[in-house]
């Protein structure tokens, strides 16, 4: 069995270099919620050195709140901003002799696109118009995945090791109890359930089905590095191969 393990990087965390030795895919912040040209270049070089697949991590323009502010932007604006961010990272990747492989929206852009078909379509169209060979990463079973499929993009359905789930398969909003899983044992058990059994237990106790093609570890988490090591060990023990 194979699984992709991804992390959101270039967001100002000291553990980026070490995480790049453990994950198979890196989602690199493109400046709208975190990062800048220099952090993008540094992350790209480190990812290439470690053989890690590189992806753009576009966001709403929200550096003050780390891309976690809900915004009601017109789809055309989201399309333009997504293209802008993908293009910025793409230029750096190309200049370093690499190939960009995927796009994964960040924060509230990701969450809103999971439920809003118009927003999802704007993102999928931007990815398609920039490079139709790019993989679109989105929440498992979401509108973003469906939009990507309509544009005939390769999609990758994502699950989260450290986030609580609602009964409909969506993430618990960060403003609500149960949004973040701080207990390492619980996060590990949830991840293995999603990857091996295709199910996740919601905060209300209801089991719901999920398709796990890639697992996200948040690079800004306090214990991200230690958890990544433990998760890799658990995968190895179960003959689950981490590969992009």
From Swiss-Prot:
Q: Which GO terms describe its biological process?
A: carbohydrate metabolic process
Give the source species: Salmonella schwarzengrund (strain CVM19633)
Q: Which domain of life is it from?
A: Bacteria
Question: Metal-binding: is it a keyword of this entry?
Answer: no
Q: Which PANTHER family does the record cross-reference, listed alphabetically?
A: 5-OXOPROLINASE SUBUNIT A, UNCHARACTERIZED PROTEIN YBGL-RELATED
Q: What family does the entry list? A: Belongs to the LamB/PxpA family.
List the CDD domains: LamB_YcsF_YbgL_like
Which EC main class describes this enzyme?
hydrolase
Q: Which gene encodes it?
A: pxpA
Subunit structure, per the record? Forms a complex composed of PxpA, PxpB and PxpC.
The keyword NAD is assigned to this record: no
Key words, A-Z: ATP-binding, Hydrolase, Nucleotide-binding
Which GO MF term does the entry hold, naming one?
ATP binding
E.C. numbers: 3.5.2.9
Function, as annotated, reads: Catalyzes the cleavage of 5-oxoproline to form L-glutamate coupled to the hydrolysis of ATP to ADP and inorganic phosphate.
Official protein name in the record: 5-oxoprolinase subunit A
UniProt cross-references to Pfam families, sorted A to Z? LamB_YcsF
Query: What's the catalysed reaction?
Result: 5-oxo-L-proline + ATP + 2 H2O = L-glutamate + ADP + phosphate + H(+)
């Amino acid at each position: 069995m194979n699984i992709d393990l991804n992390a959101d990087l270039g967001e100002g965390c000291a553990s980026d270099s070490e995480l790049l030795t453990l994950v198979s895919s890196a989602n690199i912040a493109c400046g709208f919620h975190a990062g800048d040209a220099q952090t993008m270049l540094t992350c790209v070089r480190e990812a290439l050195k470690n053989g890690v697949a590189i992806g753009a991590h576009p966001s709403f323009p929200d550096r003050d709140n780390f891309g976690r502010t809900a915004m009601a932007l017109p789809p055309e604006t989201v399309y333009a901003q997504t293209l802008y961010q993908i293009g910025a990272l793409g230029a750096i990747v190309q200049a370093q002799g690499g190939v960009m492989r995927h796009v994964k929206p960040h924060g509230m852009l990701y969450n809103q696109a999971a439920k809003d078909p118009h927003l999802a379509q704007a993102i999928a169209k931007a990815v398609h118009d920039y490079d139709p060979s790019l993989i679109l990463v989105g929440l498992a079973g979401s509108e973003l995945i469906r939009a990507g499929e309509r544009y005939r993009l390769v999609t990758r359905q994502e699950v989260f090791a450290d986030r609580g789930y609602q009964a409909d398969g969506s993430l618990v909003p960060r403003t609500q109890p149960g949004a973040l899983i701080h207990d390492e044992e619980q996060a590990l058990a949830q991840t293995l359930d999603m990857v091996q059994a295709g199910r996740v237990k919601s905060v209300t106790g209801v089991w719901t089905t999920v398709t796990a093609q890639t697992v996200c570890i948040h690079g800004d988490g306090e214990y991200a590095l230690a958890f990544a090591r433990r998760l890799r060990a658990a995968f190895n023990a179960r003959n689950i191969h981490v590969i992009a």
